Amino acid sequence: LLNVNLTGGEPFARKEIVDIAKLYIDNTTIQSIYVTTNASLPDRIANFAEVITDYDKKIDLTFQISIDDFPKEHNKVRKVENLFENCIETYRKLKSMNDRVTPVVSVTVTHENCDNMKNIFKYLTEDCKIDSLKCTIVRDEGVFKTPQEKREKIFNAYCWLTDKIKEYSKIKKLRNYNLKSIQGKLHSKKDEISWDLTKKMYLNPKYISPCHAGSLFGIITAAGLVYPCEILENKLLGNLRENNMNFMKIWDSTVTKEAKNFILKSKCNCTYECA
């Protein structure tokens, strides 16, 4: 295990998140921790970064901060007062730390912001001085369905934004990861591959290449349930609490092998950019 992603909900709502991170450091071979956050708790996030980098001098930390729009619109959509301001405060706190701490703003392109993406990008990079920024495209999930008339506009905005991020990265106006580290280089390359694959299948969903859910990556829920990914909710691999917290026992099990076989044979596919 080289990397662990701590996600939510909001991971920093868990007051014991520092202890959770330490358990991964002490009991696995991780080299990096990647945290996705809405940045509503700047002080708690900064404290986490300080404590963990002091606890282990080799761990790289990346904080993905979600910002989707201008301040007023972002706060309204997320239904949290001053959330945008907290995002910027969090970003700046983390940016002032050592080079093993990398904050990166992540924009999800949706039907609500796609028409204004160029202005949002300009505002974030020029007015807010954000110099690490990535993006994902909204995915239909549960009851949420992207309005059909907006899908092409979302796609065009996503293509423009990913191209702009790559352009700015080449001229060093954006620095999304610590490229001195192996994990930073892997994360950076993974983003580029993910963007290219997503562009090929967003408007016309189709199988392109084998999915490695259940082998290269998997997820653990807050209840200790292990799945190959967040999409295949009917493919429970096991419960850590019923297996003496032994992840590898579940990972090497017959159930997991059957799930991987299903993924391979069914040509399971999606635009799961979070992995």
Would you name each region that the model predicts?
Residues 1-61, 153-157:
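Conserved alpha-helical substructure of the radical SAM core
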Residues 10, 37-41, 67-69, 107-109, ...:
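Short, flexible loop/turn elements at secondary-structure junctions
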Residues 15, 81, 85, 253:
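Conserved phosphate-coordination/catalytic loops
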